[in-house]
């Protein structure tokens, strides 16, 4: 076995021991915490489809928006064979690490992908996090392509599985460039016609806190800030974790300032967004002002520099659901509905309408920039999420770039 394989086995054993010991730890944990947009599935509203329906060709199946109900769930398309010569989830460049998928592991993988597939892959830093880590953006495919699709992951710290899946998607399409295809679309043609703009880990500080705890902090000032947030959240009854690293592992979604980046984008009516949290916290604090955080500023500036973007798939965990709409009207609402429907039909995930405004990246891009976006919530287990969840999440998400390309290619 390679050292990384041995680390992966150790990680699984550690997760088993951790889960077995959870009954002894007085901290927040739930079998499935649905994404922050809703309190429970029962509290989510299924919204009737738009009155006018357009059709899109996705994975060889023509779909149309129903008039009165959400799309019927179909069996997830998870049995398609990998492209010839494609690495399996447990092999290749991008694989789960000892702790999950850390920022240094991502940096190492980005460098290896550049070295191996540099003809069709580039990456750059678009800014720095609170604790001084680079925020990377990748271009997969033809950088001069007339159409761009954005893929994002890792905006919430404890949702590091989303970064792993997004990075594996990059390798999947690059390694299968010459021989791979899905639903009648060749990867080579897809990557010639589209530039996929990928932000694999928007919140590197949050990911490192969730995986490696307070020891991952690089600067004394940031450590002092985080220790104060933990003390304040404990005093306010927002956490019952006895140790700060349990607090991070089970709870942490925010950046190193205690701001939830997916509540911090400069939505035109940001001041009206209510999250219920008024000070730095492990989640849902929207910050002192719109786009106050360096991560939010970097992503916003980069998105605006790209020009026209066809759409975005934002990967999160957990819940195995797809969120769409966020209250958008007109043609963008219809296109967002159809995109969400295509993703649901491929993955078998639940289709959820959500008009609640969060000042998320999706809200800002869809409502203010007019770009169709959907949120794909992978996996369905407690935090900290074991890497054993990766295989199932990967099978469901593997071909979603193709689904998006077929959708926007019509």
Residue ranges and their predicted role:
Residues 1-10:
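Bacterial N-terminal signal peptides that target proteins for export
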Residues 82-131:
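Short glycine- and acidic-rich boundary segments immediately preceding or forming the N-terminal edge
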Residues 24, 35, 89-100, 265-410:
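C-terminal accessory segments enriched in acidic
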Residues 23-30:
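Bacterial lipoprotein signal-peptidase II cleavage site
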Residues 123-127, 136-138, 148-152, 162, ...:
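Structural recognition of the beta-strand scaffold that forms the well-ordered cores
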Residues 161, 168-325:
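Active-site/substrate-binding loop(s) of hydrolase catalytic cores
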Residues 34-91:
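Ser/Thr/Gly/Pro-rich low-complexity, disordered linker/stalk segments of secreted
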Residues 18-21:
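C-terminal motif of bacterial Sec signal peptides marking the signal peptidase cleavage site
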């Amino acid at each position: 076995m390679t050292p990384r394989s041995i680390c992966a086995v150790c990680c699984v054993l550690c997760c088993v021991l951790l889960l077995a010991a959870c009954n002894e730890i007085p901290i927040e944990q739930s079998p499935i915490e649905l994404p922050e947009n809703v309190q429970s599935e029962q509290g989510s509203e299924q919204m009737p489809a738009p009155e006018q329906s357009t059709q899109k060709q996705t994975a060889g199946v023509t779909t149309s928006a129903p008039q009165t109900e959400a799309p019927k769930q179909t069996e997830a398309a998870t049995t398609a064979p990998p492209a010839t010569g494609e690495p399996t989830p447990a092999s290749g460049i991008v694989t789960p690490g000892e702790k999950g998928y850390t920022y240094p592991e991502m940096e190492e993988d980005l460098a290896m992908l550049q070295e191996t597939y540099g003809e069709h892959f580039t990456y750059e830093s678009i800014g720095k996090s609170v604790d001084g880590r680079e925020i990377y953006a990748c271009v997969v495919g033809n950088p001069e392509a007339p159409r761009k699709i954005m893929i994002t992951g890792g905006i919430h710290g404890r949702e590091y599985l989303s970064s792993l899946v997004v990075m594996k998607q990059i390798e999947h399409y690059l390694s299968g460039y010459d021989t791979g295809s899905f639903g009648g679309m060749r990867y080579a043609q897809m990557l010639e016609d589209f530039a996929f703009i990928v932000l694999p880990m928007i919140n590197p500080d949050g990911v490192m806190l969730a995986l490696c705890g307070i020891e991952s902090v690089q600067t004394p000032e940031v450590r002092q800030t985080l220790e104060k947030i933990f003390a304040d959240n404990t005093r306010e009854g927002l956490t019952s974790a006895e140790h700060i690293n349990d607090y991070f592992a089970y709870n942490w979604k925010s950046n190193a300032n205690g701001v939830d980046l997916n509540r911090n984008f400069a939505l035109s009516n940001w001041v009206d967004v209510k999250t219920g949290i008024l000070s730095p916290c492990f989640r849902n604090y929207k910050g002192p002002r719109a786009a106050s955080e360096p991560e939010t500023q970097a992503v916003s500036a980069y998105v605006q520099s790209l020009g026209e973007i066809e759409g975005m798939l934002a990967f999160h965990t957990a819940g195995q659901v797809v969120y769409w709409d966020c209250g958008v009207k007109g043609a963008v609402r219809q296109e967002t509905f159809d995109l969400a429907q295509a993703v649901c039909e491929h993955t078998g995930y639940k289709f959820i309408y959500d008009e609640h405004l969060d000042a998320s990246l999706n809200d800002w891009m869809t409502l203010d920039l007019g770009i169709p976006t959907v949120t794909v919530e992978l996996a369905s287990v407690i935090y900290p999420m074991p890497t054993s969840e990766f295989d199932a999440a990967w099978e469901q998400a593997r071909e979603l770039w193709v689904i998006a390309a077929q959708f926007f290619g019509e």
